[in-house]
Amino acid sequence: MQSTIVNLLQRGAGHAPAIFAPDREPLRYGMFREHVTGVVAALNGCGLGRNDRVAIVLPNGPHMATAFVSIATGATAAPLNPSYRAEEFRFFLEDLNARALVLMADSESPARAVAAEQNIPVIELEPNKNVAGLFELHSQRAVSSGSNASIVADDTALILHTSGTTSRPKIVPLSHGNLVASSRHIGETLALSADDCCLNIMPLFHIHGLLAALLASLAAGGSVVCTPGFNALKFFAWMAAFKPSWYTAVPTMHQAILTRAPRNRGT
């Protein structure tokens, strides 16, 4: 069995939904697989390939989810907190030695100016307005030629940083094999199946949201509702609209949900 992130998508039936989002049609597995292939080709066209580090600064939601999977399949994904200030982006982009930065086409993030300072090409993501997670990539500038070789299990899929609470944040590289094994283990532990739907309220620049919510669901052939992020006021409306079978969160979120629950009894 292949142990790369893109192979997780093979579990889902072509017509089955993979990604849901408010106010959009679901992205189905067959289309998701085609989309990943197209994004990898677009990255290669920009001169990006295997093990090239691509920083991602996108808001939480379906496009962040599909961008992570697609970019990790063709290069190395390095998601960053979109709320960072310029000085934080300056540190992380330099520390990553990023070969490109992916931003929403209309983004006014300070990461754009920092990328210009560091001579990092910006690739703009133009979202599809109808289907959750579909997008096109546009770049005004090519990167020097990268490797178009196929990704293997030992290649780095994801780069995160430690919190840096006691010292300088350190790079944590995670391989395809590591992420695939962990996501399958989570799925087996939770007995996830293709019938399960996860309501994701976790940020997708942290391992919790990327692994426990997104990849574990895809590994089971299930679906994920990609919300803009945690909002206790909207949580029960999302539950009613999408009828997920499970969600995952940190203790402070659980507490906020429990506090709000009595007002939403019966919804």
Where are the model-predicted features located?
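AMP-dependent adenylate-forming
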Residues: V6-R28
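Conserved AMP-binding A3 loop
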Residues: R28-G30, S150, A157-R184
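Conserved AMP-binding/adenylate-forming
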Residues: A41-E87
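Adenylate-forming
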Residues: P59, L103-P110, F230-N231, P244-T267
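Short hydrophobic alpha-helices that are characteristic scaffold elements of the AMP-binding
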Residues: V69-A75, D95, H206, L215-A219
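ANL superfamily adenylate-forming
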Residues: E108-A153, R260-R263
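Conserved pre-ATP/AMP-binding loop-to-beta segment of ANL
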Residues: K129, A142-H161, S167-R168, A191-C197
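Conserved AMP-binding/adenylation subdomain of ANL enzymes
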Residues: V180-C197, I207-W246, A256, R260-A261
